[in-house]
Structure formats: C-alpha cells, structure tokens
UniProtKB/Swiss-Prot annotation:
One of its GO terms (biological process) is cobalamin biosynthetic process. Coiled coil: none annotated. One of its GO terms (molecular function) is catalytic activity. It comes from the Bacteria. Residues 251-438 form the GATase cobBQ-type domain. It comes from Brucella abortus (strain 2308). This is Cobyric acid synthase. Belongs to the CobB/CobQ family. CobQ subfamily.
Amino acid sequence: MARAIMFQGTGSDVGKSVLVAGLCRVARNRGLKVRPFKPQNMSNNAAVSDDGGEIGRAQWLQALACGVPSSVHMNPVLLKPQTDMGSQLIVQGQVRGEARGRYYQELKPQLMAAVMESFAKVGDGADLVLVEGAGSPAEINLRAGDIANMGFATHADVPVVLVGDIDRGGVIASLVGTHTILPQEDRAMVRGFLINKFRGDISLFDDGLAAITRFTGWRSFGVVPWLKAVSRLPAEDSVVLERAVRGDKKALIVAVPMLPRIANFDDLDPLKAEPAVEVVMVPPGSSLPADAGLVVLPGTKSTIADLLALRENGWDRELVAHVKRGGHVLGICGGFQMLGRRISDPAGIEGNVRDIEGLGLLDIETMTEPEKVVRNVEAVSLLHDEPLEGYEIHIGRTSGPDMARPFARIGDHDDGAVSPDGRIMGTYLHGIFSADRFRHHFLRALGVEGGQMNYRESVEEALGELAEGLEASLDIDGLFALA
C-alpha cells in the first residue's frame, strides 16, 4: 500500500479540496509520484474522468495538479443530490441507483470494499497518496459504517491532519471541540492540524496555535494565508456562489439564476475570468438584472424540479422580458432542456412529475431515458466554426425543429439547438468556455472583446502560485514525513 496522508476538516468548505490540490502540486514539484483520493464525495459538480466515468470535479482538478490522468478510482463513491431526501449513487464512476437517508447508512459498510479496492489501485506505483475527507469527522451520529472520514482512516491506517478555517471564525473552538468529541480510536489517528484562510499578520495567531496544542496535544503544521490564487481555481461547493456579490459594472453582464440543484457551475469560471465580463449569480427571491446581455441557464441535477423553482421565482417571465429587450440566452444541459416546449419523464426518473411544459424559447422537446450519457468529447462550434473540448453528463433525448440549427457537431452527430434569430442557444456540452478561441468569438458576437487569455494556462499558473504559498507557510517536510 502506498504512503498516504488524509486531510479532514472541522466542517464543510474549510478549503480541503484546494489544499489537497495545492499539496499535490507541491509533491509533484518535489519529484514525487503523487495521486489524489477521496473515498466519498457529495457534489453535483461532476467531471468525466479520463477513463470514462463520473468523479467529483475537485478530484479532476487534483489529478491535474498531480500531472496524471483522472480516474474513477480517485473518487470511488460520488453522491449527487437530486431531491431533499435522496441522491444519485455513483460507484467507481457508474450509476448504482438512488441513496436515501437511512438506507444509505445501511449500505455504507458494503461500499467500503469498493473504496479500498480503488484506494489500492490509486496507490499502485505512487510514492504518495493525498486523501481528502468529507464534511467533518465530528459528526459522530454518522460514524457507524463511515467511509468518508475516520471510518476510512482507521480501516486503511492512514494518519490524519485536521484543517480549520479561521476566516469563518471560531477556529479554536472548532478544532478543540473536534478533539473533545472524537472517540479515542479516532483521536489517535490525528497527527496534527493546520489553519487555513488567515488574513493579516500571522504572528498575531501564535498564542492561538499554542492554545490549540495545549488543549489537544496536536502539533501545528502551520497557517495558510488568504491566497489570491485560490479564486482563480474551480470551486466545488455551491456555497461559494451564495457569497458572490456584484462588482464594478462591466461591458457584458451575464446573469445566472441560482437553481436549487445547480450542477457543473464551473462552466462559468472562464467567463468570470474575463476582464470585460461580470457574472451575476441571482439568488432565489431576486430579479434577473435588467442590464444583462446574456442569461445562462446552467446545468442541474433535477431539471423538472428546478424548472418549477425557476417559475416560482418569476424568472420565466423575466426571461421572456429579457428576450423581448433583445437579450441572449444560453442553456447548458438541463438548462437547454428547460428552454424547450416540453419535458417528459414517463418512467419517473426525476420524481413524480411525469410531464411539464417548458419555457418555450426553443422549438424542441425532451424525453428522459434511463441510460445516462457520460463522456468527454471533441466538437466543433457551428456558430463560429471553432473547435471545442467538453464533456456530457445527462439523461434525456432532445428533438424538434430547432435542432435543424445545431449548436455544435460531435463526430458524426449534432448537438444542441439555436433559435431562428440566433439569440436563444442550447447545448448538452459542459466546459465549452474553456476553449479560448470559441469564447473569444462567442463574446465578440455579444459585442465584447474577450478570449485573449489562455484559460487552461491560467489554471496551471494558479496551481503553481498555490503550491508556492503552501511551501512558504506550511511545514511540508513534517507533513510528508507523516506518511
């Protein structure tokens, strides 16, 4: 078994995913063969791995940081929330059904075998595996059968480092409280802690570090400052969208309704990085900005439920008004399906609503099907005759007159639809704005100069800056010596 270290957090969104990505790049820079691993992830931000299955987008980024192809074994259990009570269960990249509440708790011990099999595969030939936990190990009500945090750590005998987020406040209580509540067996797995997202003079927290060590006996591996490079990396959790605020007005305003089950929202990251573009995330209860030039209906894990939510917020009427003002609309994946006249779900794949009227902005209809399309693709934009690389993750087959004006061509078949006037567009392709030349032509058609930067290079540069920041602020030698 490969040497490994596991990073667990005092809660969700403390920065574990980005820290692991950065440490993967640090290890790679030091000449180590390093691999990422996350036993269980809950996210609708999925990626198509290089071996053709679904994994969390964070593990895809971590594989990039390692300089290796992504694999379904880097995230063997993925939960994609689709209702308030249940999630789609994906095991080693493939859909295995729905996981609901207590049933999933009973299922977890059976999943440990798949987790350990994947862990062995990821570690094969590696010098170091950096493991990311999920949520918090202090949720002792979920400890029985756990595969995400201490259950995995104890089973695989992997040492743990706890991550605390000082930016949200209460980091001393979070770490000391976690120490207090953990059972002795789990507490013994923890070798130390680190503090993330510190703003200001780090020396002012010296007494805080000493206090944490005094209460817990754990050593400190350092304090990570607030690093600007993190903002240029794809985020995994939709909680970051809720914190987005409007900045200075730009040449193009792109409005994005925050659907309850929004998925693959990192499609928007290349647009956010454009100097002339402002992406405005519109929360429930707020109106679409009247000055938006483009509205993007993003991907969603539950198209029908989110279409109902869109109507409840009045965004359907505002979308019609936006179009009448001459605005443009782009629907991606589930957002594309919403733009049509009707969505039918005769098998009840998404729930109890079997048939629903769409927004009617494209003359298309969608029928859901049990078979899920999961693949990386190379395509050509038929709007601008530019190459695209993207990926598909969807259920459903779409047809109708507007499909005669496709958005893109993938091999020997067409994708998406465009309205007769060209202002309403839909596609099943995720990741299209990462293609620089396509983004340049797409924005130019909206009256904005963009696409000058190389987006993929900017992500690589951000990973490099993140690694430099971690090297400067953490005891990397001490951390890696734990494995």
